[in-house]
Every structure is written in structure tokens, then in C-alpha cells.
């Protein structure tokens, strides 16, 4: 993935953190802690002064007296020496970075000057030398006392090579300088000209001018100093480059990284770029996580998230920070994801959003639609010119074709060197990168017009590494390659593609909008200006046209004061700023293993089967997922499972059907041969006899294994082989124990399923309600009450279906995925269909489709099915539930009232044999309640009036209703009409306190958008709600069949939805068009099946569902 990287703009606020604790080096407090910074500052200022007077004769003239005084007694200060200015600057930087070697150099240098001053003060009785000696004694004392503060080390480098470069450079500089002195000797005698050049170039002007008989022209001294500075700079760069190579990846390092990527590479799209070979790496002590980095300008720059187990990330980060502290580097991270940035932030780093990464979800990618018009037109235009696309894995590309692709990629590159660090691999055609994808645009004549190379992102993703196009290729080649990759991704198992990284995306996007503030527009203009060189805007534009998902990426750094240096170091690392290089190209380091010392813990090299060539650990040796931590009892059962396999016993055999259920076996006469199967719930071993309890869905039976019947070896095997919870199959005859208990006298048995987890307490079962929901299968296996509830539910649903079928109703199924949410006032769930690139809702009610069938002529129709409402979860609400809706032509809501009551009473008979329901009594036990006969019927306003003790009717003014609400502390919204306020009063005063099933009728018309108005009472609808024990069980309407009135009401609802009301219905034009074909007068009924089961069984909604929704484990 190619990307530009810079520090972020001012509108992106940093996340402040407490300073990160460094290793316990130095005092960390007191005045001595500041000595390195003060020493570095003083020498830094001095080096600038030396540089300035070396190039300025005017300044040199004005500072002549103090310069000579300092040069004589305190510190060398030659009149012109750029090389000495460079030396002092390097020493200042090293001191500020707390380098121990810089402390030694400065201390030894000051001691030598001190010795000189002492000798002069004694021999010449020079007061100035004596004063300088005292000052130097104080300075040396301070340095000695502050020695622990200079704790950072210098990386090992190619010292001899750097020394050779220095000697050669100085020799050349001296010879060239000698020639200059000969050309422009000034007053310098012939015999002193070579020594003058040698002193100025090589000896850093150590010899004073007074020791020579004359001097050359002034500009010659400046050039001679420049020659020395250039030689010294070349040596320093050689040393630094050697240090970088010395700490680059080794083969074992890369092998370990690839092993970690095999396990954890699916999370970070930049993970594979960690195998770039011109990076160094540091591992967590366990080897389970690692961080790759590069040091630029004293900044230890990590890239992306740590690689490996997220639980080991903090240890890897700590190791990385410790390493940086040892060498005095500032720490920074480029391109961290939100998860990685959180981990770095916890370690003390400050976080800034750097930009956004463009992610294409291939299953959602489609060229249709207005937003994709630009890409679609480009693709069509290029295809008309005969351009096709070829996609292959790198391992499938013949060597000669890969070599040609590499040649073209280099030829089409618009920069001298390959850019990229955190989001680029830096190599192409390596044998270890066989899983990478090569996408080529092939012109009609067979020539290659464009190339994309993408690296793996876990098993199902790829991340863009390289993008090239032929300068003369038609516009749209890149769009064709990207779209073809997305649309044919199924062939390669690809579901996501990471494209370019857009720095400052929010600035480009928001700064171009109408109404953007002046600061944002100015900032965008600045970025557009710099985009002429760094392609900041081009990267954003090239990505946004694909309508990607934008995923933020972050810059993490140690200290706000280091932000400028971090930004510059990032630009150097990414290739936007090129520093001078000598010798072999840096690109070579990214292709080959140039590291000499492996960073991976040595103990892991052999233990993990790492390969020195960088390939992933061998099959069977690669680190494997450890899985969940197993309790001891589970580990014991796993060991037993292994033991059974070693004995040739299949713990999960093929089926052999039992001859009887447990209940059938219990009811069989004594002596009957039976074979039963079930779960082993209890085992009691008495030596010569073993008793066990086996349960299937029908009931329990005692199994008796007698030593006299089966022998000693087999009875011991039974006791040793089985654990509680195992599924077993037992054959034998029905008989009795010595105490007369009915038992299955076992002759044969076998395991049909080994249970790896112990069952809960045999008496208490699962006592925690959340555990009962999460492990519903265990609860049903051991809890007979839970089983009875499911059996009752099955009986209720079957009764409802049979009752309606017996009345001539036809059962149908209507769509669950709907384009418009309607049929009820509720918040919907939203989903997306990739085939049509279309947002859909999970239905909140089947009503509108069932009414279409009524228009079609189905006079009696019903559906029992699942609906989904994005609402709260409590004892009577679940996000998905089962609903019954039935419609009968030439009927009304009063006839639906009779139908509803009879359906529930018949369902109660199916569950218990009588028209009764079970309700919790005062002590919590279930008691029977008779629900036979007629049920109470009240109007909604009548029920509210009874609760308030005042008259309330449909004509009651809104102000009076609001006053009553205030008086009884009932909340309402000021925008509600009288109907909405009255219904809110009903829900608070009536519904919550209703116990015996009661029908409440005549609800406000404004709250019933799909209901026919009451034929005689204005302001109310022909509707009722059935309520029992505070729960609404069902509702019924005289359906609204007037299409004009229905359109007006749904239009009002759609306006509420547009205003932000999530529960308001949307306008369903297809339904309205169907209604305009005429629908007969119809009565409609809706019942919550789950709530009917709750009513009949006395359980909560969770207890009546096989698998209620539960929060995920934290």
C-alpha cells in the first residue's frame, strides 16, 4: 500500500497522556537530570556561532577578541572551520540524547584543556588561565556528578569502514585544498602551504594562525573547512547506514514474524508490511508479539500495530520503549489502527489521527448507481479499447513474466527511489511472497498497460502495495484493475481490499463543502499547494471515487515537543525527503536480509522451527492457536477422550436407533428386552453393583449394572469409561433392584457422545439466570421445568395453527426482508443485500403483505412467523419474537375479539387439558387461574376515568389531559395531540395494573393509522387491545380499507419518520397501490405468540424461548 505520511493538522485534537515511565536509568529528578540538555544546548549554540563566523568575515571581525579568549583558555574556537562546527554540533546532539560516549569525549577534552591551563598558570603565572582552570574544574565536577544521566548507548556500526571513508575524504580534501592554497596563497610562504591545508582540513584548525608566517585568502579557509566537514559527514552517514543494516531483519526474524502473521494477521491490513527487510524488530520476551521499526533522525519509528497476540502487545511495546530509552531515541508510530493506537496510548504515547485508510468490501462493491458513475464510465471506456485484466498469485507467475513486471514497475516509477515504509513492501517477485496478488491490465496488442501488486491481509483480504500504469495507457486503467479485482474476488477468496491511505482526508472532504469555515478552507488550500509534490489530494481523490469504507489510522508519539522531528523523520522514512546516501542503494536492503543479529528470542528459534531464509515456520511447527484455557475437569475429560481413541473406542460413533424411549421402557412389562439412549445424569458405584440414571426427552430410568450379570472387568470398565453428562446407549431387560426399584438391568452399553464439560450441581442445576440463557442446552438437559415450558409452547403453537385451520383459514408465508418498514410503530433492524446493493429492513410486522392477499381475494388468511423490533429487552420484550396475524373478510374487530379469546382458551386446553393458566402466587409458586367464559370489555377512556376518578372521554380537551398528567406525574411531550396523551395515560394507569385478561376498546384514531374509524363514536378507532397481568397480548382492528384515507395517514407517518421518529411507519407505495384495487371490509387480529405462552405457563419471555438473545460475553 503506497501512502504519503505527514503530521496531522490542527483540527485533529491529540489525546493527552501521562508521560511514559522509562527504565530506571538516571535520577529522573533534580538539577543533574537537566545537565545533558543544558550541555547540549550550550554546545549547540556554540556550533552555530562557529558556523556563522566561519562564513561571515564581518562577524568574524566583530567577535575576534572574545573568540580568541575562548579559544585560548576554554574551548577551541578557530576563526574559520566548518568541520569543527560540524563536530561540535554532533557532540551537542549526542549530549542532549544522553549518549555515554559523548560524556566521555567532552570530559576527556575538558580535562586536557584543564591540564594545559594549569601548566600555563604555573609557568607563566597567567591569571586568565587560572580562572579558566577553576571554571573547568567546576564543569568537570558537574559532569562527573551527572554521569548516571548519560545512560544511552550507541548502536554498533561499521567503525573501520567509517574510519576509512573519513581518512580517504580528508586525504582528498587536503590535496584539493593544497591545490587551492597554491592557486590563492595570499601571504603564506611556499613551504607552509601544505601544512596549512592539512591543518584546516584534517586537524580541524587545531594549530593557531600565529604559528604560520602568513595566511591565504579568506574564502580559501572557508572552503578548506567545508572539505573537512564533507569528509566527516560522509563518515557519519556511513556509520549510521551501517548501524541500520546491522539491525535490519534476519531470516529467523522474518520467519518468526510470518509465524505470528499466520495466527494474527487478519486484524491489521498493514501486518504483512512488517516483513519489509529494511526494518528492525523487537519481540516481547515470550516471542508472542513483535514491533518492527526504523530509526531516522534519532526517532525510533514503528509502523502499524504490533504483530502477534494482542495480549502480548503491552510486553512488546514495553520492550520497544526500553530499547529506545537505552539509545536515547524518541518513539513514534505511523499508521496504527484504533486498536493499536489504544494499546500505544495506554503505554504513554500521545495519539493523533493521521488520516484514513480506504477499505473496499468486495461483496458490497457494485459499479451501478449514481455514486459509481465516474468509475463505471472509466471502466467502460477502457474496455471498449480492448483492455482486459489478468489476476494471478505471485507463485503462479512464470519467472520471466515476473521479471518483466518488475522491469516495468521500475520504469514507470515517477521517483528515483521506491517510496513507502509503513505501507509498502519494498520488493516484488520474492519467492516468499507467493500469496501476493499481481493484477495486470493487458492492452489489445498484448502489452501491459498497468500493474497492481497486493499483499495478503489475513486469509480473506489483500492490501495494496504497488500501483503503476504505463504513461501512454488510456485513462481508466487503474479503475478497471481495481473494479475487476473487486468483482472477481470470490475466485481468490477475497472479501476485503485495502487501498491507498489518504492523509488529512477529513480536511479535503470537509474543506470543500459549502459553508466550511475560513480556517478549514485555508488549511485545505495549503494541503492542495503541497500536493503538487506529495500527492496528498491525489491519493484522496483516487480513493473516494470507489465509495470505500474509511478506517482511521493514527500517529502516536512520545512528546509534543518531538512532533516536528517525528514528522520530518516520517517524511524521510516514507521517501518524501531524501537524505544523501553513499554506496549501495537502500532499495537493496528491502529486498535481501541484511541484518546480522537476530532479535527473536534464541529459545524460540529451535522451539518454533524458524527458518533462516525467512519462510514461515514449517507445517506442524508453526505456532498454533492455544484455544480457551481449560479447567482441570475439562482437561481430565480430554485426556480420557484421547485414551478412548487409543483403545479403539469411537466416542462419537454412527447412529444405531434405540428400540424404546425411556418412558416406553418404563411402561414395558418386566422381562422386556429394550435398548434406550440418553444422557447419563447420575452414577453410584458400590463395587459389585453400579447404579446410573439415564434421561432422554421423555423421562428418566435407573440403569443397574450387576457384577454377577456382566462380570468384574465389564462393571469396572463401565465405572471408569463414563462421566456424568456422557451420552450412552444401554441394552438389557426391564426388572427390579433388590429394593424393588424399577430398573433397566444392563447387558450391553456403548458411548454415543463424550461430554467434555461437567454438569452443574445435580440438585440446584444452573442457578444463575444469565448462565441459563447462555447455556440453554445445559439447562434443558437437566431442568425438567424448562423442558415442560418448551413442550407447552409447542402445544400452544400447534393449537393456534390447528384452530385457525379448522375455521377455514389458510396459512401463508410473507417476506421477512422488506424495503419499507410498516405495519406497526416500532424501530426496525437494518440490513443490506449485496446482490442488489440495497438496504433492507427485517420486518416489524407481516400486516401489509397479508392485506395484499386480502386484496387478492383470500378471505381467511393467517401467518405465524418471526418479526424483529429494535427495542428494549426485559421480562416481556425480546428483539425477535413470534407473532400471529389473521385476517377475515366481511368481519370486524368485535368478531376478532371472540376469535382471540377462543384461540387462547383452546391453547390452554392443549397445554393443561382445561381452560386454565398458571400464574405465580404470593409465595412464588405457580397457581391455577380459570380463564373460561367471557372476558371483561372496557373502553380505553372508561378505564382511564376509573383510575383517575374523573370523567375522561374522547372529547376531553388536550389542556385538561395535560393537567391530569401533571397531577399524576405522567410524562408526555408538548407536541402530542389529545389522543397520544390519552393513550400514554392508559399505558401508565391501566395497562400496567391489569391482571385478568381484559379487552380495552376504542383507541384514539391518531394513534391507529391502519384502523377504520369507529362507526358511531368520533375520534376513536374500531380497535381493541387484550391485556393480562400488565402485558399486551394482542390487538385487533376493523381494518381501514379506504385507500385515500390510508394514504393520508401513512403520509403523516412518513413525515414523522423523516423528522427523526424511528418508530413511525414509512410510506409503502406498493401497499397503497394494492389497496386502491379495493379490499373488502376485513377484521384483523394480531397476537404475540410468545406472550400467549407466557400467559398460559406463567414464565417470562426468556423462559418460553428456546434461545433468547443474550449479551455477548465481555
Curated annotation (Swiss-Prot):
Residues 1-11 have a biased composition (Basic and acidic residues). GO terms for cellular component: cytosol; plasma membrane. Binds 3 Mg(2+) ions per subunit. GO terms for molecular function: ATP binding; DNA binding; lysine-tRNA ligase activity; magnesium ion binding; phosphatidylglycerol lysyltransferase activity; tRNA binding. Disulfide bonds: none annotated. Pfam families: LPG_synthase_C (PF09924), tRNA-synt_2 (PF00152), tRNA-synt_2_TM (PF16995), tRNA_anti-codon (PF01336). It comes from the Bacteria. Mg(2+) 2 binds at residue 1032. It is found in: Cell membrane. Residues 1-618 are annotated as: Phosphatidylglycerol lysyltransferase. It is a multi-pass membrane protein. The chain crosses the membrane at residues 38-58, 77-97, 101-121, 126-146, 164-184, 219-239. Residues 1-28 are annotated as: Disordered. PANTHER family: LYSINE--TRNA LIGASE, CHLOROPLASTIC_MITOCHONDRIAL, LYSYL-TRNA SYNTHETASE. HAMAP family: Lys_tRNA_synth_class2. This is Lysylphosphatidylglycerol biosynthesis bifunctional protein LysX.
Amino acid at each position: 500500500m503506497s501512502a504519503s505520511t505527514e503530521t496531522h493538522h490542527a483540527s485533529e485534537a491529540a489525546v493527552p497522556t501521562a508521560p511514559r515511565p522509562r527504565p530506571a536509568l538516571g535520577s529522573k529528578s533534580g538539577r543533574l537530570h537537566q545537565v545533558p540538555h543544558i550541555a547540549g544546548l550550550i554546545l549547540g549554540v556554540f556550533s552555530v556561532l562557529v558556523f556563522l563566523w566561519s562564513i561571515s568575515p564581518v562577524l568574524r571581525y566583530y567577535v575576534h577578541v572574545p573568540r580568541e579568549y575562548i579559544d585560548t583558555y576554554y574551548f577551541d574556537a578557530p576563526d574559520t572551520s566548518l568541520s569543527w562546527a560540524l563536530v561540535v554540533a554532533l557532540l551537542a546532539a549526542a549530549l542532549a540524547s544522553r549518549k555515554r560516549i559523548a560524556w566521555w569525549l567532552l570530559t576527556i577534552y575538558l580535562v586536557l584543556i584543564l591540564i594545559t591551563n594549569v601548566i600555563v598558570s604555573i609557568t607563566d603565572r597567567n591569571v586568565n588561565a587560572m580562572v579558566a582552570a577553576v571554571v573547568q574544574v567546576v564543569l568537570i565536577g558537574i559532569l562527573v556528578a551527572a554521569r548516571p544521566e548519560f545512560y544511552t548507548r550507541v548502536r554498533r556500526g561499521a567503525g573501520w569502514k567509517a574510519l576509512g571513508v573519513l581518512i580517504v575524504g580528508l586525504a582528498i580534501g587536503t590535496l584539493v585544498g593544497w591545490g587551492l592554497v597554491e592557486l590563492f596563497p595570499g601571504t603564506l610562504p611556499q613551504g607552509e602551504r601544505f601544512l596549512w591545508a592539512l591543518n584546516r582540513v584534517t586537524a580541524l584548525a587545531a594549530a593557531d594562525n600565529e604559528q604560520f608566517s602568513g595566511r591565504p585568502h579568506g574564502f580559501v579557509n572557508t572552503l578548506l573547512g567545508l572539505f573537512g566537514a564533507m569528509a566527516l559527514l560522509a563518515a557519519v552517514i556511513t556509520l549510521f547506514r551501517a548501524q541500520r543494516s546491522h539491525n535490519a531483519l534476519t531470516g529467523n526474524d522474518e520467519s518468526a514474524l510470518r509465524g505470528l502473521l499466520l495466527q494474527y494477521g487478519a486484524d491489521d491490513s498493514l501486518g504483512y508490511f512488517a516483513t519489509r527487510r529494511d526494518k528492525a524488530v523487537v519481540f516481547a520476551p515470550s516471542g508472542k508479539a513483535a514491533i518492527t521499526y526504523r530509526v531516522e533522525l534519532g526517532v525510533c519509528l514503528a509502523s502499524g500495530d504490533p504483530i502477534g497476540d494482542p495480549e502480548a502487545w503491552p510486553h512488546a511495546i514495553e520492550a520497544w520503549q526500553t530499547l529506545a530509552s537505552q539509545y536515547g531515541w524518541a518513539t513514534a508510530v505511523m499508521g496504527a489502527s484504533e486498536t493499536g493506537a489504544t494499546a500505544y496510548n495506554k503505554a504513554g504515547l500521545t495519539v493523533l489521527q493521521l488520516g484514513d485508510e480506504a477499505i473496499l468490501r468486495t461483496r458490497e462493491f457494485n459499479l451501478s448507481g449514481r455514486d459509481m458513475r465516474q468509475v463505471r464510465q472509466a471502466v467502460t471506456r477502457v474496455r471498449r479499447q480492448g483492455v482486459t485484466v489478468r489476476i494471478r498469485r505471485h507463485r503462479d507467475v512464470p519467472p520471466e513474466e515476473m521479471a518483466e513486471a518488475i522491469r516495468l514497475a521500475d520504469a514507470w516509477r515517477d521517483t528515483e527511489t521506491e517510496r513507502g515504509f509503513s505501507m509498502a513492501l519494498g520488493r516484488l517477485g520474492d519467492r516468499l511472497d507467493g500469496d501476493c496478488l499481481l493484477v495486470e491490465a493487458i492492452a489489445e496488442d498484448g502489452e501491459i498497460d498497468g500493474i497492481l501488486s497486493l499483499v495478503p491481509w489475513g486469509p480473506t483480504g489483500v492490501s495494496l502495495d504497488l500501483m503503476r500504469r504505463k504513461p501512454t495507457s488510456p485513462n481508466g486503467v487503474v479503475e478497471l484493475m481495481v473494479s475487476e479485482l473487486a468483482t472477481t474476488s470470490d475466485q481468490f477468496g477475497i472479501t476485503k481490499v485495502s487501498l491507498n491511505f489518504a492523509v488529512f482526508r477529513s480536511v479535503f472532504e470537509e474543506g470543500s463543502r459549502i459553508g466550511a469555515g475560513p480556517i478549514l478552507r485555508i488549511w485545505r488550500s495549503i494541503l492542495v499547494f503541497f500536493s503538487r509534490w506529495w500527492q496528498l489530494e491525489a491519493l484522496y481523490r483516487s480513493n473516494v471515487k470507489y465509495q470505500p469504507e474509511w478506517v482511521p489510522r493514527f500517529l502516536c508519539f512520545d512528546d509534543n515537543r518531538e512532533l516536528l522531528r517525528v514528522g520530518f523523520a516520517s517524511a524521510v522514512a516514507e521517501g518524501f525527503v531524501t537524505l544523501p546516501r553513499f554506496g549501495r542503494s537502500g532499495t537493496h536492503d528491502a529486498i535481501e536480509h541484511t541484518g546480522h543479529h537476530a532479535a527473536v528470542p534464541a529459545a524460540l528459534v529451535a522451539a518454533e522451527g524458524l527458518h533462516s531464509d525467512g519462510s514461515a515456520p514449517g507445517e506442524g511447527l508453526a505456532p498454533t492457536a492455544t484455544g480457551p484455557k481449560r479447567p482441570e475437569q475439562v482437561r481430565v475429560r480430554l485426556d480420557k477422550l484421547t485414551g478412548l481413541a487409543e483403545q479403539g473406542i469411537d466416542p462419537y460413533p454412527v447412529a444405531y436407533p434405540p428400540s424404546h424411549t425411556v418412558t416406553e421402557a418404563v411402561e414395558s412389562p418386566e422381562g422386556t428386552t429394550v435398548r434406550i439412549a440418553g444422557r447419563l445424569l447420575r452414577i453410584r458405584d458400590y463395587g459389585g453393583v453400579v447404579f446410573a440414571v439415564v434421561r432422554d426427552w421423555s423421562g428418566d430410568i435407573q440403569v443397574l449394572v450387576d457384577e454377577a450379570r456382566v462380570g468384574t472387568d465389564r462393571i469396572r470398565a463401565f465405572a471408569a469409561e463414563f462421566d456424568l453428562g456422557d451420552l450412552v446407549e444401554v441394552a438389557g431387560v426391564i426388572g427390579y433392584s433388590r429394593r424393588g426399584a424399577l430398573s433397566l438391568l444392563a447387558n450391553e452399553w456403548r458411548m454415543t457422545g463424550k461430554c467434555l464439560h461437567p454438569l452443574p450441581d445435580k440438585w440446584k442445576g444452573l442457578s444463575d439466570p444469565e448462565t441459563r440463557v447462555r447455556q440453554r442446552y445445559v439447562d434443558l438437559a437437566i431442568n425438567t421445568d424448562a423442558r415442560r415450558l418448551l413442550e407447552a409452547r409447542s402445544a400452544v403453537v400447534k393449537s393456534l395453527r390447528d384452530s385457525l385451520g379448522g375455521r377455514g383459514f389458510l396459512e401463508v408465508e410473507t417476506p421477512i426482508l422488506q424495503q419499507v418498514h410498516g405495519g406497526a410503530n416500532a424501530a426496525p433492524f437494518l440490513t443490506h443485500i449485496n446482490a442488489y446493493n440495497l438496504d433492507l429492513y427485517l420486518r416489524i410486522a407481516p400486516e401489509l403483505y397479508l392485506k395484499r392477499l386480502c386484496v387478492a381475494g383470500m378471505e381467511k388468511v393467517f401467518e405465524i412467523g418471526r418479526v424483529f423490533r429494535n427495542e428494549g429487552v426485559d421480562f416481556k420484550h425480546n428483539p425477535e419474537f413470534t407473532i400471529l396475524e389473521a385476517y377475515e373478510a366481511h368481519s370486524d374487530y368485535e368478531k376478532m375479539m371472540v376469535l382471540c379469546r377462543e384461540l387462547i382458551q383452546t391453547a390452554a386446553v392443549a397445554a393443561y387439558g382445561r381452560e386454565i393458566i398458571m400464574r405465580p402466587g404470593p409465595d412464588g409458586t405457580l397457581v391455577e387461574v380459570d380463564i373460561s367464559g367471557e372476558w371483561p370489555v372496557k373502553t380505553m377512556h372508561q378505564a382511564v376515568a376509573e383510575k383517575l376518578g374523573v370523567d375522561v372521554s374522547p372529547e376531553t380537551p388536550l389542556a385538561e389531559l395535560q393537567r391530569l398528567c401533571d397531577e399524576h406525574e405522567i410524562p408526555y411531550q408538548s407536541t402530542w395531540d389529545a389522543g397520544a396523551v390519552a393513550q400514554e395515560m392508559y399505558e401508565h394507569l391501566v395497562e400496567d395494573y391489569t391482571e385478568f385478561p381484559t379487552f380495552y376498546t376504542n383507541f384514539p384514531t391518531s394513534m391507529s393509522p391502519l384502523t377504520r374509524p369507529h362507526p358511531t363514536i368520533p375520534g376513536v378507532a374500531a380497535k381493541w387491545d387484550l391485556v393480562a397481568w400488565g402485558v399486551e397480548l394482542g390487538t385487533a382492528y376493523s381494518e381501514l380499507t379506504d385507500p385515500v384515507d390510508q394514504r393520508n395517514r401513512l403520509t403523516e407517518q412518513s413525515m414523522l419518520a423523516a423528522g427523526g421518529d424511528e418508530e413511525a411507519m414509512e410510506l409503502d407505495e406498493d401497499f397503497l397501490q394494492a389497496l386502491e384495487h379495493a379490499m373488502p371490509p376485513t377484521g384483523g387480529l394480531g397476537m404475540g405468540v410468545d406472550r400467549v405462552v407466557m400467559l398460559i405457563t406463567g414464565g417470562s419471555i426468556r423462559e418460553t424461548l428456546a434461545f433468547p438473545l443474550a449479551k455477548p460475553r465481555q
